Amino acid sequence: MKSLLGLVIIALTFSTFVRAQGGHEYSPLVEKTVNYKNWSLVNLKTDKPEDLRSIMAGKKLVMVVYFAPWCGNWHNEAPIAAKLYEKYKDQGFQVIGVSEYGSRADVRTFFGEAGPPYPVVTESESRDDKQKTPHYGYRQLTGDTRNWGSPWNIFLEPAKTNQTGDVLTEKAWVVNGELIEDEVDKFISSHLASASAGVITPCKN
């Protein structure tokens, strides 16, 4: 019993240390049951609804990042998300931002005149919606105990998702906090390589 208690204390101490470094909330990449659903949300640039399946079409790996525009931890991750997107976009990697708990005007202000480098859609605009969004539900399923859960990242492999129905995938790799760049970079690289290796090129006459 004492040894078990000791392990629990060590785990909690390590978790606190990892999450508290320099105001960051880093979290490891883990596979979780999430029952992630398809959605249709309004695009920040076009002001028109976009369907997730449509955005994923033709991609090998998709990272959906949920964020609040006013959140300091999102401000920490945003450059990393943009960097990874620029590095791997030509290899079939897609980033999609889903804004939460802040107005679309605030989201536009955050990204500046150039706008976001990848598609951004809106799920909610009010802090009052904190416990009403699908984002909140996914966080509960994956054990995210943070107050706002920004950022929250989920990785989808389009080739392995359900092509019909509400639920895209039962399980997925998620990050309940800020990305650990080196870890996620390796994950993206290996998954893109695996996806490419699995592509069968038709014979040409």
Task: Enumerate the language-model features and the residues they cover.
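N-terminal targeting signals for export/organelle localization
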Residues: 1-43, 185-189, 194-205
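A short beta-strand-turn-helix
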Residues: 36-62
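Sec-exported extracytoplasmic/periplasmic mature domains
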Residues: 57, 76, 83-90, 112-119, ...
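Hydrophobic beta-strand anchors of alpha/beta hydrolase catalytic cores
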Residues: 63-64, 95, 153
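Conserved redox-active cysteine motifs that mediate thiol-disulfide chemistry
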Residues: 66-83
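Second-shell loop/turn segments in exported
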Residues: 67-70, 96-97, 173-174
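Conserved segment of the thioredoxin-like fold in thiol-based oxidoreductases
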Residues: 86-133
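Thiol/disulfide oxidoreductase modules built on the thioredoxin-like
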Residues: 114-116, 126-187
